[in-house]
């Protein structure tokens, strides 16, 4: 399982920005090309791995949208996209986001107290976005049934677990100089 994701990661280009090495990948960046077969493989794995007994699928714009949309289409579960733009709708939840590389506000709409949600993201690196999202939703009376990210890089998922948030990832990677090293791949035997 996840052969295409594995192959696409180990062949992903790496670019240097200052002292930090970024891998460029279709799931995290939308370039060079996000193949439907890759989305299919990822979504099928998440369907086997995640608690899908939920009222809503939630993702943060922008790159969580393709995977979350695929899951929504496969399951018929409505999708709520956490936006970087305020809409001033009734019940809108505002949260302050801080990651290793940006700060800003995020806005949640279309979710109500008592809803059960699956949160889906493309990459966890620092875990900052998911931490504030989970806490804000819980404070609003929303039950987090599961949190799944496609790619894990860095210590963010460990930091989330230390904060009491059980997060699942499909692959764990690190960047070693100019290449992506896949350290762990989800197995359906887990």
UniProtKB/Swiss-Prot annotation:
Gene Ontology MF: a single term: hypoxanthine phosphoribosyltransferase activity
One of the record's GO cellular component terms: cytoplasm
SUBUNIT field: Homodimer.
Entry superkingdom: Archaea
CDD domains cross-referenced by the UniProt entry: PRTases_typeI
Protein name, entry field: Hypoxanthine/guanine phosphoribosyltransferase
Keyword field contains Transferase: yes
Organism: Methanosalsum zhilinae (strain DSM 4017 / NBRC 107636 / OCM 62 / WeN5)
